[in-house]
Amino acid sequence: MDKRVSSIESLINLRFHVLSMLTYVELLKKLKEIKSSGWVKTHRTGNTGIGKTIEDLLGIKENNVPGPDAEKLELKSARKNAKSMLTLFTKSPLPPKANAVILARFGYAAENGRKELHTTLNAISHNLLRGCTGLKIKVDHSRIEIITENSEVLGYWDKDTLKKTFERKLPRLMYIKAESQGSGKNEEFWFNEAWLLQGFDFENFLKLLTAGVILVDIRIGQYPNGKPHDHGTGFRIQPNQLELCFSKREQIL
C-alpha cells in the first residue's frame, strides 16, 4: 500500500459506507481513476452540474456520507475557475425581528409588488443600495454586526453561535475541485484535486471576514401577509480559498 495513503488513513481514520460499503482506500482509488479518465461531460446543466456529476461518478446519492464514528462527512465540489462564491453556511441574524427591520429600511419593490432585499455585505466598507449608502459588516469583540452608515446595529450574530453553526455544518469535509470547459449541456469537468478538511479555524474565519474575503449575502423576501422571509443569509467565500477556514488540510488527490 502507498505510504501516503496509509498515513492519511491512519490520521483521519476515515471509512465510507456508501451504498456498496465503499471504504476510504477504495474511494481514494476511485478518485484517482476519475482523475485519470480525464474530461467528463456534465450530468446536469447549471451550477449544480458539478456536484451531480461527481456524486454519480462516485455512486453517491446525496452530498454527505458517513465518516468517522458514524458522523457525517460532507462532500463539496467546485469549479477551479468559478466566479460564483461558495456558501459556507446560512444563519439568520439576531434579534428575531432583525430581518423585518432591515427589509423595512432597505428593501425595494419586487416584480410581485412585495418588498425584497438581495445584497452582499463586507467588513471593509458600506455597500450601495439603489445609489445610497447601505450596510456593512462589523467584527466586534463578541459578535458580528450589520451596521448602517451611522453605526446603528440592525442585526448581529454571536461569535460563539457562528462557530458552533460552522462546526455542525462542516465538521469534516471532502472537497473536490475540477477544471471546467464549455457551457450548458456541453460543459465538461476534469476532477483532478481533492482535499480532506477538518478542524474549523474560527480565528482565521474572523480574519478572512475582516479582510473582505468572506462576504455575507442577504436574501430577504416577503410573504403575502407582509412578514419577511429569509431566503438564506449566507456567509460565502471563493471556492479556491475554502481550505483557509480549516486548521487541518490534507490533499488526497
Each language-model region and where it sits:
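Nucleic-acid endonuclease domains
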Residues: 1-71, 77-253
